């Protein structure tokens, strides 16, 4: 009875194609809900990160090496939102890939490249914040625009090379050809790689994450020591010198920036950890993860691209002010690029 029921309700991605994948659709109500949730994430990733990029590039007050890194990170998240999430949304909800094999490879390549680019950007931002907090007065001479440019280049080139190697050379499927052949069907876009490449993928997540955790642990330790030192010097001497006052203001500003970006790093780790663990389990235990669990892990990672602008809006008054100027159209006025965005 069960087999007859399954056969009667069996749906295919392409009804008239022999090698079509099996379609496992959700109920109409759940599909509408999922389209709303996933679509909202894509729109937020596109619009929010576009606002970040425009803010940094337009307002001269934001032209700094650290902010250029943030703008480049926002560019990667923007590309995830516009070129990855909409198509993944259809695949996740319809359980079929309707965009062809060629675009499947390109989409998968972009998916991996842009997401790992975000990880490397955050790693370099952690290095930037570490230098800024531990040595704020010397920081401008250490982390220059050229250094920022090198970090940005590495953050884009390495993920693009890695993802191209995975999806366009075929070496990632060596040793699992039978599995790839068994999973191959019309209307599918499965990413299957061997254990060696899964380990490389894990290291691409683990190493930057470990660097971030170590650096931010040191950052908050140093920040705490600085806060105690400043409080002691202020309470011990009412006639604080202008140099000490300047040091205190600079240190306070850098600590605040480090705190905000620390929240960004934490959001990245929480978002990406489920997907990373899931890929390891699948690679070494025979792809035992249910489809809905895998999709949840994927979208947890995707949604990270939409989180960063919300974090900036919550913690950065200058971003809220820049956002208002952009949305109101005031940036189209002359000399708007010289508008002061900081209260101090």
Swiss-Prot record:
It comes from Rattus norvegicus. GO terms for cellular component: plasma membrane. It is found in: Cell membrane. The gene is Taar8c. Its main location: membrane. The keyword ATP-binding does not apply. Belongs to the G-protein coupled receptor 1 family. The chain crosses the membrane at residues 37-57, 68-88, 103-127, 147-167, 197-217, 261-281, 296-319. Glycans are attached at residues 4, 18. It comes from the Eukaryota. This is Trace amine-associated receptor 8c. SMART domains: 7TM_GPCR_Srsx. Keywords: Cell membrane, Disulfide bond, G-protein coupled receptor, Glycoprotein, Membrane, Receptor, Transducer, Transmembrane, Transmembrane helix. Residues 1-36, 89-102, 168-196, 282-295 are extracellular. The keyword Oxidoreductase does not apply. It is a multi-pass membrane protein. Olfactory receptor activated by trace amines, such as N-methylpiperidine and N,N-dimethylcyclohexylamine. Trace amine compounds are enriched in animal body fluids and act on trace amine-associated receptors (TAARs) to elicit both intraspecific and interspecific innate behaviors. Ligand-binding causes a conformation change that triggers signaling via G(s)-class of G alpha proteins (GNAL or GNAS). Residues 58-67, 128-146, 218-260, 320-344 are cytoplasmic. GO terms for biological process: G protein-coupled receptor signaling pathway. Disulfide bonds join 21-185, 96-189. GO terms for molecular function: trace-amine receptor activity. Coiled coil: none annotated.
